[in-house]
């Protein structure tokens, strides 16, 4: 099984996405709409389709879910927004990483891998490298700071090549 360990902020959205959704939530008189850029979801979908990968959420947004009977249940509007965005593109979240008290993402990925021995290959898509130093060869690094950043077309080939190694 191929796995994509997926962060959300800085991968499926950017600072520009947050600004747009902030204003949209004001227009709809809603507290907050969680911004996920539809184009970036299409890039993710392409990676998933071409590698048959499963998505494991590493984002701090995974705390907006609980796992019950092997299903992810959203705990709030943010969780529902994430699930709805994924569903619109026929994407699903396979699992979430466990919580490390030190909040080190690399430790959380390690714990997940230790508990799931049916993994053939994996990549990590994240906008940060902190805590992921041991996984540099598996990392697809994105950037949150600009509208053209986040997951983009340049990352698709890199991700596919790493997963097909």
Locations of regions flagged by a protein language model:
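C-terminal cap/substrate-recognition subdomain and adjoining C-terminal extension
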Residues: 74-165
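Alpha-helical substrate-recognition element adjacent to the catalytic core
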Residues: 2-100
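Hydrophobic/aromatic side chains embedded in well-ordered alpha-helices
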Residues: 1-3, 120-121
């Amino acid at each position: 099984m191929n796995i994509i360990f997926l962060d959300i902020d800085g991968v499926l959205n950017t600072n520009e996405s947050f600004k747009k959704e902030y204003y949209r939530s004001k227009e709809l008189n809603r507290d907050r709409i969680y911004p996920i850029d539809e184009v970036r979801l299409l890039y993710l979908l392409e990676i998933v389709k071409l590698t048959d990968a499963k998505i494991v959420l590493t984002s701090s947004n995974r705390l907006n879910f609980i796992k019950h009977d092997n299903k992810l249940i959203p705990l709030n509007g943010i969780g529902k927004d994430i699930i709805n965005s994924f569903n619109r593109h026929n994407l699903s979240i396979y699992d979430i990483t466990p919580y490390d008290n030190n909040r080190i993402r690399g430790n959380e990925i390690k714990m997940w891998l230790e508990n799931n021995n049916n993994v053939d290959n994996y990549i990590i898509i994240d906008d940060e490298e902190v805590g992921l130093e041991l996984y540099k060869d598996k990392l697809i690094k994105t950037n949150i700071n600009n509208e053209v950043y986040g997951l983009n077309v340049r990352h698709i080939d890199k991700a596919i090549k790493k997963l097909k190694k």
